């Protein structure tokens, strides 16, 4: 079963962890600065396929140590945009697939540079705007007689 590390246990990160867990096809570790939010989610929803953990990306050595002690296949960053280059560097160093939700163009450029030559997928900008906005736009276009 693939193992995924979700960084950030806010609303989006918790939703991502819950949805992945609900498929029954992933073992998920959900991390936040403290154990409070991930543990609360796991306890309230009885998510047996989600392991709560406390990680601080401002301490990349500790995050890298945690990643190195597990067999993760991918990392999903639902952290603030400025944390993503650090997460991308850890993903690259540990040969993980990488996803983030940022819309920040400069950070996306840095992630692209980090990913050059990697043999894993690095997919930034998986957030609300490119996905949901495209769906809404497609629906609205269907209401026009001509474009």
PLM regions with names:
Residues 4-8:
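Conserved N-terminal Rossmann-fold NAD(P)-binding element of oxidoreductases
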Residues 34-37:
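Helix N-cap at the beta1-alpha1 junction of Rossmann-like dinucleotide-binding domains, i.e.
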Residues 45-59:
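Rossmann-fold cofactor-recognition segment
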Residues 101-124:
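Rossmann-fold NAD(P)-binding glycine/threonine-rich loop
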Residues 12-13:
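Hydrophobic/small residue at the entry helix of a nucleotide-binding pocket
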Residues 57, 74-85, 95, 101-106:
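N-terminal glycine-rich "phosphate-gripper" loop used for MgATP/nucleotide binding
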Residues 57-71:
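Conserved Rossmann-fold cofactor-binding substructure of NAD(P)-dependent oxidoreductases
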Residues 120-147:
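Rossmann-like dinucleotide-binding core of oxidoreductases
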């Amino acid at each position: 079963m693939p193992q995924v590390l979700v960084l950030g246990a806010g609303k989006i990160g918790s939703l991502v962890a819950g949805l992945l867990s609900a498929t029954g096809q992933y073992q998920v570790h959900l991390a936040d600065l403290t154990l409070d939010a991930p543990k609360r989610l796991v306890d309230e929803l009885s998510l047996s396929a989600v392991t709560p953990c406390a990680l601080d990306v401002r301490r990349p050595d500790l995050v890298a140590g945690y990643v190195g002690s597990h067999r993760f296949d991918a990392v999903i960053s639902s952290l603030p945009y400025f944390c993503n280059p650090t997460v991308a560097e850890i993903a690259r160093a540990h040969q993980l697939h990488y996803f983030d939700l940022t819309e920040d163009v400069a950070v996306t450029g840095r992630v692209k540079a980090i990913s050059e030559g990697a043999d894993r997928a690095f997919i930034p900008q998986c957030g609300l705007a490119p996905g949901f906005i495209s769906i809404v736009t497609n629906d609205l276009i269907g209401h026009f007689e001509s474009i």
